[in-house]
Curated annotation (Swiss-Prot):
Single GO cellular component term: plasma membrane
UniProt entry keywords in alphabetical sequence: Cell cycle, Cell division, Cell membrane, Coiled coil, Membrane, Septation, Transmembrane, Transmembrane helix
BP GO terms, sorted: division septum assembly; septin ring assembly
Highest taxon, organism lineage: Bacteria
Residue numbers on the Cytoplasmic membrane side: 22-567
Protein name (Swiss-Prot/TrEMBL): Septation ring formation regulator EzrA
């Protein structure tokens, strides 16, 4: 029983697959059948009939016969073959020979594609032929009119073309022969060949018109304009040479020889070969070269004027530097008697003197070159610019060194003034301590005050020791200033602390009789106070009073600050 059921299932599956494959094949057969009918219904005969108004000879006749033969072959051979193959495909499908049916369908598609492609080629060739004939009828009138215009212009200005006239007339005659050949090909039905000939004559006439427009100017350039420019350049060169300008580095004679050869080549290309493009290119190159040579001559003139203008100024600046050097050298000798110059300062003076030597050497070198006959001004500009840079550098070195010499005296006066201020500050601080009612001064503060006094004394000795070493003086003065200012700040802080302690203890005395612990703490604070331990005294007194009367210490300190601000 199970075997029978399995067999039935297999048969049903095979039937379903076969049905599905047959359905797809019949669907493809229907598609190819529709394609075949579409090809058969193409209006090829109607399209071919479009050329019947043309002359049925030559190319046109050949095209017509070939197109008709190809269409007949499609209708009588290809499509019947397709019909036969479609029938075969149906038979193979009905017999479940699906693989064979697919092969036949592929072959049918290839046949239909080939037929379709052949038809498209025919339609394109028909369109090209008809278009060529239509376009030829339009263009021939324009080309003939252009021919008449070119001939008229050539005859009207024949005197401008010289020996080129014969060659241009020959080209024009060839264009006319081409027009006549076009008409012959058209008469013979060769419309596409005639199209190519017509386009060729159109291009030929365009080129001739271009020649007519450009040749006169190019001939004038070759025979008059450019030779005149070269002669003018040569005359200018000779005139500058006679005025004493050194121009050998420009090598104009050699350049003129080269340019004249190029001019002859351009003329040959123009006259013998009618090669306007290359001749124009050479003439443009010659024009650029002439402009470059003029730029070089102009640069030489400008360089000469600039050197003649700048050399006296640079000479004067150098002489001023030498005078400054003599003056500063004497001033340096005097300064050395009172001040000790550092190695860096002395190096500045040496660098300045070395730069002066370089300037003198370079200036001598430039003057020697200016006296020679073969040195161009433009070749000296770099050295002139270098000389100016050297002079500017030397002036900067001199100004820096001289400014430092002048600053030494200012530094000394400033140091003495600062030292006097430090002495006054320290004296006032000591006097303030003596006038205050404090029990005494802590030992460490006394030591700092004595150290400050000693440092002031050392700076004073440095200022009396000649020659002065100002860097050392300034360093010691800075250290002394820092120490004195620290002593002053600590003294003010200590006196303020003493006043705070007295205010707090005085306030705490209100509670001593009632608070035994507070009384003992205040006694300890007083003991430390008279032992010069003001920080410890403040801490104990403030803690005790704050405990007895919270917020009181802060109010006392605020009151003190307010009173100090109004003093």
């Amino acid at each position: 029983m199970e075997f029978i059921i399995g067999l039935i299932v297999i048969l049903l599956a095979l039937f379903s697959v076969g049905y599905f494959l047959r359905k797809n094949i019949y669907k493809e057969i229907d598609r190819l059948e529709a394609w075949k009918i579409e090809i058969l219904n193409r209006s090829i005969v109607e399209e071919i009939s479009k050329i019947k108004h043309l002359k049925m000879t030559g190319e046109t006749e050949q095209f017509f016969e070939r197109w008709r033969a190809e269409w007949d072959d499609i209708v009588t051979a290809h499509l019947p073959k397709v019909e036969e193959l479609l029938y075969d495909a149906e038979e193979y499908s009905d017999k479940y020979r699906f693989s064979k049916a697919k092969q036949v369908l592929t072959h049918i598609e290839d046949l239909l594609s080939a037929a379709d492609s052949n038809i498209e080629d025919i339609l394109k060739e028909i369109a090209d032929l008809v278009t060529s004939e239509e376009q030829n009828r339009k263009d021939i009138e324009k080309v003939k009119e252009q021919y008449q215009t070119v001939r008229k212009n050539l005859l009207a200005y024949s005197h401008l073309y010289g020996t080129l006239y014969d060659k241009m007339e020959q080209d024009l005659d060839e264009a006319w022969e081409g027009i006549k050949q076009y008409e012959e090909e058209t008469e013979n039905g060769n419309y596409m060949k005639a199209r190519k000939i017509l386009l060729e004559q159109d291009r030929r006439l365009d080129q001739l018109q271009l020649y007519i427009n450009d040749v006169p100017k190019l001939i004038a350039d070759c025979k008059q304009t450019v030779p005149g420019q070269l002669t003018k350049l040569k005359d200018g060169y000779q005139e500058m040479s006679e005025k004493g300008y050194k121009l050998e580095h420009i090598q104009i004679t050699k350049e003129l020889e080269t340019l004249n050869k190029q001019l002859a080549r351009a003329e040959k290309l123009l006259i013998d070969e009618l090669n306007l493009e290359e001749a124009s290119s050479i003439l443009q190159m010659i024009d650029d070269a002439i402009e470059t040579l003029y730029d070089q001559l102009e640069a030489e003139v400008e360089a000469g004027q600039e050197i003649k203008s700048r050399m006296p100024e640079l000479t004067e600046a150098f002489e001023k530097l030498e005078q400054d050097h003599t003056q500063t050298k004497a001033e340096t000798a005097l300064v050395k008697e009172s001040y000790k110059l550092t190695a860096g300062e002395l190096d500045q003076q040496k660098a300045f003197e070395k730069r002066l030597e370089e300037i003198e050497k370079l200036m001598k070198q430039i003057r020697e070159k200016l006296d020679r006959d073969h040195v161009a001004y433009s070749l000296l500009m770099d050295e002139i610019n270098q000389l100016e840079t050297f002079i500017e550098d030397a002036k900067a070195l001199h100004d820096t060194f001289k400014g430092h010499l002048q600053s030494l005296r200012k530094e000394e006066l400033q140091a003495r003034e600062t030292l006097a201020e430090l002495k006054t500050m320290l004296t006032d601080t000591v006097r303030q301590l003596h006038k205050s009612n404090i029990p005494g001064v802590p030992a460490e503060m006394k030591e700092r005050a004595e150290k400050a006094q000693e440092m002031i004394h050392q700076v004073h000795e440095q200022l009396e020791n000649l020659p002065l070493n100002m860097p050392a003086v300034n360093q010691q003065l800075k250290e002394a200033s820092d120490t004195v200012r620290n002593v002053v700040d600590e003294t003010e802080e200590m006196l303020s602390k003493v006043d705070q302690i007295e205010r707090i203890i005085q306030y705490g005395n209100r509670f001593r009789s009632q608070n035994h612990i507070l009384s003992e703490q205040l006694k300890e604070a007083e003991r430390r106070f008279y032992a010069y331990d003001y920080n410890g005294s403040f801490d104990i007194a403030a803690a005790a009073v704050e405990k007895a009367s919270p917020g009181a210490v802060q109010k006392l300190l605020a009151q003190q600050e307010k009173e100090y601000q109004h003093q």
